């Protein structure tokens, strides 16, 4: 929901948004975003890593990241250029079927996992890895978890392959690490500032209000979460307004009432 007032509502004010948005003929540029933004960057970055080093650890990690990103692309579009991208210096690559892409990705994950497992004690420097601070074992668990996720996505169309990949992903025999099992295994890039705090306070001085759309539903159902989400409004008795949870209409630049 949009909690808007003052700076937080800038994009919804008339001078920025107003009536310039088309409700009935919105842009469809988003349909190609994964092709235009994700695929070129992923392939280019993968090639940059291979050109910069022969170290199998960063190359394997880059391979895992490539699969993580492009698995979403093939999930979205189905057939995509994949297995022959960049081969022999060609600028054009044929499309692979979604099955071919998935099978190739499984092979790449397996290769990366095996390579990292052999080199599991040879961590990267923390500055070179903003996700796991160079911890190779964390990347192995991430790759196995990604393999498990992909295996579950094909369980109704390719049960045999799915079962094989699931067993490989969760296998902890003979010192294998298996999948992520605790919060410390989560893959994320830490930020120094909480983005929600930045939006609600740094940008807006704490003047963040519940929208009328949200408060009307919550009031109608007497939602007990209201006391957690906000505080009750306070009005002068002369205004003949009952104090409670009153949301602001989306787009108000300067709220008259608080709460």
PLM regions: where:
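Single conserved hydrophobic/aromatic residue that forms the stacking wall/gate
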Residues: 1-12
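Structured, solvent-exposed acidic/aromatic patches
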Residues: 13-65, 69-259
